């Protein structure tokens, strides 16, 4: 037993394995740790057809790495599009086209019935009856916070540990910091040491590298139907480059860069500084 005056709870998260029949077969894997990567590298040696369940950033990155190994790869996504809610429709279309040009099959709006096989994976059966051939399945279906210890200790938790603006839990002196969230950790550590800092939520952003392209999306990219956004777009379909900026009340609120992300730092700063449409047009 280790007595403490202050404690920081930072046990991270684990890959979510959906309750699909066959998810325990030897050729079904997740990719989160170095050990996971080493296991997949070994499985790839005897595989020809791979299925990635999940069409988010990590799923597409996994699909690309498997394709580079020479496997036939299919991505299965339950949502109507890849990266649902994370990027806008023009970007989805272009990114899907890039993936298909690289030989990756994309199936969206599908539900998984089971992973087929007895001792080895033989395919993934869809709810509609179709079976996608596979001898390797990668699950990329999100993560879940590790909250069992927190709950046992009496910390309030929902899908994650619940904290206030100081990153303190419902138990005085115990703080929690989110998985891979450096700023959260800094605030929690400072407050545990006696400071009184408040956490300021960061602007949501995602980045993707693979399939010979790169993607960066940040902020509000037109996801709220009630807001009359203005958009500015620069598109080069031949070179598969897209820049799209979203404005609300004349202020930059979000942006997407595809194919050329060299200006991501500039765009991030512009959103933080609440640059106007006029100011941004002057830089185009």
Residue ranges and their predicted role:
Residues 11-69, 163:
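Glycine-rich dinucleotide-binding loop and its adjacent helix/turn
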Residues 2, 68-165:
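A Rossmann-like FAD-binding core segment of flavoenzymes
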Residues 172, 180-261:
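Mid-to-C-terminal Rossmann-like scaffold of FAD/NAD(P)H-dependent oxidoreductases
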Residues 24-45, 119-125, 130-191, 281:
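FAD-site-proximal beta/loop scaffold in flavoenzymes
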Residues 261-280:
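A short, polar/charged loop-to-alpha-helix boundary motif
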Residues 9-10, 52, 126, 139, ...:
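Redox-cofactor binding/interface segments in oxidoreductases and associated redox assembly factors
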Residues 2-14, 53, 132-142, 185, ...:
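Short hydrophobic core segments
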């Amino acid at each position: 037993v280790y007595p403490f005056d202050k404690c920081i709870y930072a046990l991270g998260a684990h890959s979510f394995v959906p309750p699909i029949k066959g998810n325990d077969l030897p050729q079904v894997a997740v990719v989160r740790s170095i050990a996971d990567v080493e296991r997949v590298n070994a499985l790839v040696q005897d595989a020809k057809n791979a299925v990635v369940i999940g069409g988010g950033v990590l799923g597409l990155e996994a699909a690309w790495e498997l394709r580079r190994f020479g496997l036939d790869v299919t991505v299965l996504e339950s949502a109507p599009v890849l990266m649902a809610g994370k990027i806008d429709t023009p970007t989805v279309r272009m990114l899907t086209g890039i993936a298909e040009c690289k030989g990756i099959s994309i199936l969206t709006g599908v539900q998984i019935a089971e992973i087929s096989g007895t001792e080895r994976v033989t395919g993934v059966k869809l709810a509609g009856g179709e079976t996608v051939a596979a001898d390797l399945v990668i699950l990329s279906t999100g993560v879940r916070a590790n909250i069992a210890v927190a709950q046992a200790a009496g910390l309030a938790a929902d899908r994650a540990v619940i904290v206030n603006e100081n990153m303190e839990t419902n138990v005085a002196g115990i703080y929690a910091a989110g998985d891979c969230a450096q700023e959260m950790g800094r605030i929690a550590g400072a407050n545990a040491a006696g400071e009184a800092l408040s956490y300021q939520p960061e602007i949501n952003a995602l980045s993707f590298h693979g399939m010979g392209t790169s993607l960066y999306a940040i902020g509000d990219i037109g996801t709220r139907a009630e807001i009359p956004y203005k958009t500015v777009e620069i598109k080069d379909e031949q070179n598969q480059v897209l820049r799209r900026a979203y404005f609300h009340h004349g202020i930059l609120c979000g942006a997407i860069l595809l194919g050329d992300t060299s200006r991501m730092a500039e765009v991030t700063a512009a959103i933080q500084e609440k640059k106007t449409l006029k100011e941004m047009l002057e830089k185009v």
